[in-house]
């Protein structure tokens, strides 16, 4: 019996691809491979490129809002640029579509163009094809100063760990929409789910400060992304439950849905915030420049630990949103 890709899951499959690429191409040709975006030497700067693929049936909790679908397609790509401290320069969109009504298609494209304008990244090309469902593939292009680019590697024991904003809001909004319940009173959570905003400005502040040792975005879940920083840096992580900035509506929505609010904040994903590390003195300087929430520290090793509200320490299993998984 032959193994299938579901036996690996998305992250191990990506590692398999990276390993095969590195066996052929030199390290100077595959800079950024395995990070949030690829880096191409462009003289005094890096050209930063990233690509994300979204499916109608998997990535959009309300496919009856085409403008929001277009917006989100751009934003998920821009979030990877933000994680690298890159300034957007352009966006390429490839689409595979069923025979949509033109009004629906125009609304979808209005969302794409609106987002491109928001991020100051003009739509510069793409491709079209046919499919049984809506498939949207975006490629974002940016630039970053060579000595300022943010990477997943570089965290050191003693560094502090911080996030740029509240956790669990997008997850709570997504689950509320999928439940079919009344979303009245939870407009912010719904907006965070359907029209997230990439933290481009925050990424630029972090990059230009020169104070950050590692960074990534947390669209696939906080614990999963902490695992990425940990593995890339060869360290461990310790976070504190009472320091996690849960969005104010997360506990109430979780109660309505019978969900654990901590689970939504730690594992679900859909939070378009950044998580980063910096030495204590650097983190203090950064706190004067932008909103941030210190949630823990980098440790010598031993995986990811959580200290709960009673002071009890336990290990967290590194998981989060992942495609190509069994079940």
Curated annotation (Swiss-Prot):
Positions annotated to bind substrate: 59, 270, 321
Annotated binding of ATP, by residue: 126-127, 152, 219
Functional description taken from the UniProt entry: Catalyzes the ATP-dependent phosphorylation of thiamine-monophosphate (TMP) to form thiamine-pyrophosphate (TPP), the active form of vitamin B1.
Residues that coordinate or bind Mg(2+) 1: 51-52, 127
Residues where Mg(2+) 2 binds: 52, 80
GO biological process, one term: thiamine biosynthetic process
Pathway(s) the chain acts in: Cofactor biosynthesis; thiamine diphosphate biosynthesis; thiamine diphosphate from thiamine phosphate: step 1/1
Top EC group: transferase
Protein name: Thiamine-monophosphate kinase
GO molecular-function term, one example from the UniProt record: thiamine-phosphate kinase activity
Residues that bind Mg(2+) 3: 36, 80, 217
Keywords: ATP-binding, Kinase, Magnesium, Metal-binding, Nucleotide-binding, Thiamine biosynthesis, Transferase
Phylogenetic lineage: Archaea, Methanobacteriati, Methanobacteriota, Methanomada group, Methanobacteria
Listed EC numbers: 2.7.4.16
CDD domains membership: ThiL
Extra remark beyond the main annotation: Reaction mechanism of ThiL seems to utilize a direct, inline transfer of the gamma-phosphate of ATP to TMP rather than a phosphorylated enzyme intermediate.
Species of the source: Methanothermobacter thermautotrophicus (strain ATCC 29096 / DSM 1053 / JCM 10044 / NBRC 100330 / Delta H) (Methanobacterium thermoautotrophicum)
Record's catalysed reaction(s): thiamine phosphate + ATP = thiamine diphosphate + ADP
Family annotation (HAMAP family): TMP_kinase (MF_02128)
Protein family according to the UniProt entry: Belongs to the thiamine-monophosphate kinase family.
Binding site for Mg(2+) 4: 36, 50, 80
Chain sites annotated for binding Mg(2+) 5: 220
